[in-house]
Structure formats: C-alpha cells, structure tokens
C-alpha cells in the first residue's frame, strides 16, 4: 500500500488572464491521488479591486471547488491572496519541510514591482506593531507581510476585458524601466535569502518549498539544505508539484494537454529517511 502523501503547488493565479488556468475542473487530474493538497499562495487575487463583484465570484468558485472536488486542502496565503485563510506557512515531515509562499524572504515582498517601496514601508509599519521579541519570529513576519499585502490594490489582475488586461499587463511589465533587471536580481537573491530564513527561523528544516518568483527549480542552498520552487501556471514559466510523504519528497513537472493539467516527468526525489537526505536529480 502506498504511503499517504501531500501534494503542493502554487501560483495558479486563477481569474488572471495571464494564467493558463481557465477552468478549475482542469486541475482534477492533479488532485487524483494525494491524501491532502496544499495551495501555496497566489491561488487567486483577493486584494482590493475596481471589480469587487468579480473578486467575490472568483473567491467563491475557488472555495467551492476546493470543498467539493479536492482532497482535504489547505490554502496558504500569498501576496495576491493575503486573506484567503489564516495559514501563512506549514511544516511537514516532522519539521523537515517548510512550506510558505516565498515572499517572506523579501523585505518588500515583491522587489520587482512598482509597488515595492510602498510594500516595504507598509511591512515596516506592520512589524512595528509587534513587540521586539515577537518581531524576531517567523510568525510575526508573515502576519506583517499579509497586512501589508492586503493594502496594495490590484491593477489588471482580475480585469475581464482582454484589451484592458493586456494594456495593464504591458504597463506592469515595462514599468519601472528596471523591472526586468529587478526580476533577474530577485532570482539571483532568492537562494541566499531562503537559506538565511531557514538558518534564522527553521534550522532543523532541510527543504523549503516556495513559489512566488515564478521560476520553477530545485537548488541546493547549503549543507544538506534545499530550495524547491513550484513555478507558476503563467507563461513563459512552468509549474511543478511537490509530493511529500513520511519517507520521501518528489518534485514533478505539470503538463498541460488539451486544456487539462497532468503530472509529468520527475525532476528530483529526496529520501527524507536518510541523514543527510539523499537526492536524485533528473538529468
């Protein structure tokens, strides 16, 4: 009998025309098999919008789908859905695996965004409401980030009009002019910042599973420490799932065929029973 396992993926961005996810039902093959599912942030955009009725509709659709068509599920918050639940991080495999959306590693949440300076300020203000002792904890940092994210309004993200969405997306991609450089710099900084977060807050964890940067991959970030990014359902990036059981962790690609998402090839496999963890990477 196969061991029970939890499946993790992130950054569906449902309701955003930038996402390839048009129908929630197309996720069903990904939900066939796991005993539990974790949606690791940015499942949709719940922030203030010029179209609140659209946000409410999308939110209702997601919650209904998760309740009726998925295994027991946990929705972890992200910077786009800071109020989707009160869960900001989870630990699996007796603390071996830390799961969080990933923006927690950045002081300004989304350093490539035109809102980065404002988010950094809001983050500092939110952290200041905690005691000095609390500010040193991961829980306080995550709560402060969600407060900050909830105050940043959407731009084009749930715009249903194709032309308006395209204009908004183009503007976001081109402004500020340094945006591409900021994205690349964030990619470069991510392994170092993720390693620092584990060292400070979860030194016993051997694997950090995140999304946020839309760059799927598996990377060693220290002696026996690994960073796994599940990518996104938004081109040109690809999405991955992470399956975690008591004995092992497996990273698999997500393939989209005829509008339906399915499990693809294995990218990496970790034996959590070994000390240190043994890792097999796909060629």
Per-region residue spans from a language model:
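Long, positively charged, glycine-interspersed low-complexity recognition regions
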Residues: 16, 56-59, 218, 227-283
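Flexible, glycine-rich phosphate/dinucleotide-binding loops
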Residues: 46, 82, 106, 236, ...
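N-terminal short leaders/motifs
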Residues: 26-54, 157-165, 177-205
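Conserved beta-sheet core of the metallophosphoesterase superfamily
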Residues: 90-122, 187-252
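Short, basic/low-complexity N-terminal boundary segments at the transition from targeting/disordered tails
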Residues: 64-76, 193-207, 280
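Active-site-proximal loop/helix segment associated with metal-binding centers of metalloenzymes
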Residues: 102-192
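Core catalytic region of metal-dependent phosphoesterases/phosphodiesterases
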Residues: 2-9, 14-96
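A short, terminal or domain-edge coil/loop segment
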Residues: 88-96, 126-142, 261-273
């Amino acid at each position: 009998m196969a061991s029970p396992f939890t499946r993790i993926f992130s950054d569906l961005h449902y309701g955003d025309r930038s996402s390839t996810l048009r129908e929630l039902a197309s996720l069903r093959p990904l939900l066939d098999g796991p005993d539990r599912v974790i949606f690791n942030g940015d499942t949709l955009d719940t922030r203030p919008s010029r179209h609140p009725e659209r946000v409410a509709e999308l939110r209702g659709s997601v919650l209904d789908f998760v309740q009726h068509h998925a295994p027991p599920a946990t929705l972890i918050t992200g910077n786009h859905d800071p109020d989707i639940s009160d869960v900001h991080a989870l630990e699996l495999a007796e603390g071996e695996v830390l799961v969080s959306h990933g923006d927690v590693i950045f002081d300004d949440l989304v350093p490539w965004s035109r809102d980065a300076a404002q988010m950094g300020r809001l983050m500092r203000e939110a952290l200041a409401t905690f005691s000095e002792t609390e500010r040193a904890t991961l829980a306080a940092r995550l709560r402060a980030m969600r407060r900050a994210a909830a105050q940043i309004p959407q731009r084009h993200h749930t715009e249903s009009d194709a032309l308006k969405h395209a204009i908004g997306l183009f503007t976001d991609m081109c402004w500020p002019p340094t945006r591409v450089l900021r994205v690349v710099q964030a990619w470069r900084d991510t392994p170092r910042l993720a390693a620092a977060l584990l060292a400070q807050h979860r030194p016993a964890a051997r694997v950090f599973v995140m999304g946020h940067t839309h760059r799927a991959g598996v990377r060693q970030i220290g002696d026996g420490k690994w960073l796994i990014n599940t990518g996104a359902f938004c081109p040109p990036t690809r999405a991955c799932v992470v399956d975690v059981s008591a004995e092992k962790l497996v990273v698999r690609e997500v393939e989209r065929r005829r509008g339906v998402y399915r499990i693809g090839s294995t990218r990496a496999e970790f034996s959590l029973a070994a000390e240190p963890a043994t890792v097999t990477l796909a060629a």
